[in-house]
Amino acid sequence: MMASTTSATAAGGAFAAAKTRAGSSAAGGGACARVAAGGRRRSGVVVRCDAGVEAQAQAQAVAKAASVAALEQFKISADRYMKERSSIAVIGLSVHTAPVEMREKLAVAEELWPRAISELTSLNHIEEAAVLSTCNRMEIYVVALSWNRGIREVVDWMSKKSGIPASELREHLFMLRDSDATRHLFEVSAGLDSLVLGEGQILAQVKQVVRSGQNSGGLGKNIDRMFKDAITAGKRVRCETNISSGAVSVSSAAVELALMKLPKSECLSARMLLIGAGKMGKLVVKHLIAKGCKKVVVVNRSVERVDAIREEMKDIEIVYRPLTEMYEAAAEADVVFTSTASETPLFTKEHAEALPAISDAMGGVRLFVDISVPRNVSACVSEVGHARVYNVDDLKEVVEANKEDRLRKAMEAQTIITQELKRFEAWRDSLETVPTIKKLRSYADRIRASELEKCLQKIGEDALTKKMRRSIEELSTGIVNKLLHGPLQHLRCDGSDSRTLDETLENMHALNRMFSLDTEKAIIEQKIKAKVEKSQN
């Protein structure tokens, strides 16, 4: 490993040296050109200019040679990666590890997921990537050629995007590898890692990652399969356990929190305002109905979404107000729920101060319940005497109430998670041997075709009917298949037998050596070459 690292360092040095030499020569050439342009025609000057051009050409040739040499060094250093396969990793933070103030800086809007994936996969040691960004979490899933280098590149990307120093980010990030990363995603999809244990909306968000990745072509085979298996795990947990029964969602917890903060005698008469008619907003309306609320004002950019909610939910009066009337609507509300995709606050301290006071019957305080990330309501609004702000981090108070029962159900769900994890790991293990299987079949078929041609030439074309020729070809194919059956059986790693991955990989290495297939190094070299060439363009 040390030798390989040295090789890579030497390669980097070759690049740097070539660039330095090329830069110096180019600068010299430019100076000569300026002298010549100035009208000095002495032979000495002309000779020096010619010499400068020649030196520049030589420097370019040296730089090109250095690039080739560096690429060869990178090829040699492929041994660094051959000791272990590419790693699946998740790097992220959630409501459990970081405050909303940090999460909102890292939040990636759904329409920007494809661009984020493109930026991540352009990093030198990242092959595949996916982004899961919700109000409670921001997680990046990658397949990394090198664990340490890949993690460092992703953390640097997150730091650059958010403006948060990498050292500060690391205090709140969690990093999981391979089966731990996969299990985490399966638990997320099943609602086991949610602030609200068992909530259902996260499964829809995991599905959206797959749809978004497929539409943009950004998901590789490992990440794509992992997310699809996570969806399967999430569905099974909800169908085969009762974890979702009675489980609250972020939206229902927001409604519950608001009612907890209102005087009990005035809960049903409180004037409710919802800003944002998206998925979360729709769920707020649904849970207001469940609590007996008869009227809600909904502010939204367009009326179509509000009409759709009104059409679906007949048990409540829904009044539409356009976005331009948001502050007027807030002035008439006792409770303001916010759930929009705005990246800047809709309500600041100045806005809250301008709103009229609330009646003493309602506690004299206007409640802002903000379930958006980034936040729609500035924290400083709470500094206003007649206003209180609650965000998603404040929902824990509600969640704790019925947590024990769902924790027991979560234990049942872990059995399903483990089953789905084993299926995914078996599938991924099987990928290790696919290149060897293909190479071995191709190698055997080339020999078969060559020997068959020699045989047919000896017999003579005229001596064979079409049926006889076809029979001979089928015979040769059958012999090859019979001979390959045993070796290929020992390359199986799909979880259907007791053979371990180490045993299978040992068989694969043996076949690579015996038949000079050399598939591993060729694949790694190809990946590294593509990365190097991409970085040079």
From Swiss-Prot:
Marked site positions, Important for activity: H184
Extra information: During catalysis, the active site Cys acts as a nucleophile attacking the alpha-carbonyl group of tRNA-bound glutamate with the formation of a thioester intermediate between enzyme and glutamate, and the concomitant release of tRNA(Glu). The thioester intermediate is finally reduced by direct hydride transfer from NADPH, to form the product GSA.
Transit sequence range: 1-48
Keyword Plastid set for record: yes
Annotated catalysed reactions: (S)-4-amino-5-oxopentanoate + tRNA(Glu) + NADP(+) = L-glutamyl-tRNA(Glu) + NADPH + H(+)
E.C. number: 1.2.1.70
One Pfam match: GlutR_N
Entry protein name: Glutamyl-tRNA reductase, chloroplastic
Gene3D superfamilies (alphabetical): Glutamyl-tRNA reductase, N-terminal domain, NAD(P)-binding Rossmann-like Domain
GO biological process: chlorophyll biosynthetic process; protoporphyrinogen IX biosynthetic process
Record family assignment: Belongs to the glutamyl-tRNA reductase family.
Active site: C135 (nucleophile)
InterPro entries, per the entry: 4pyrrol_synth_GluRdtase, 4pyrrol_synth_GluRdtase_dimer, 4pyrrol_synth_GluRdtase_N, GluRdtase_CS, GluRdtase_dimer_dom_sf, GluRdtase_N_sf, NAD(P)-bd_dom_sf, Shikm_DH/Glu-tRNA_Rdtase
Keywords attached to this entry: Chlorophyll biosynthesis, Chloroplast, NADP, Oxidoreductase, Plastid, Porphyrin biosynthesis, Transit peptide
PANTHER family (UniProt xref): GLUTAMYL-TRNA REDUCTASE 1, CHLOROPLASTIC
First-level EC class: oxidoreductase
Function field: Catalyzes the NADPH-dependent reduction of glutamyl-tRNA(Glu) to glutamate 1-semialdehyde (GSA).
Pathway annotation from the record: Porphyrin-containing compound metabolism; protoporphyrin-IX biosynthesis; 5-aminolevulinate from L-glutamyl-tRNA(Glu): step 1/2
Binding-site list for substrate: T134, C135, N136, R137, S194, E199, G200, Q201, Q205
Recorded GO CC terms: chloroplast
GO MF annotations in UniProt: glutamyl-tRNA reductase activity; NADP binding
Binding annotation for NADP(+): G276, A277, G278, K279, M280, G281
Record's subcellular location: Plastid, Chloroplast
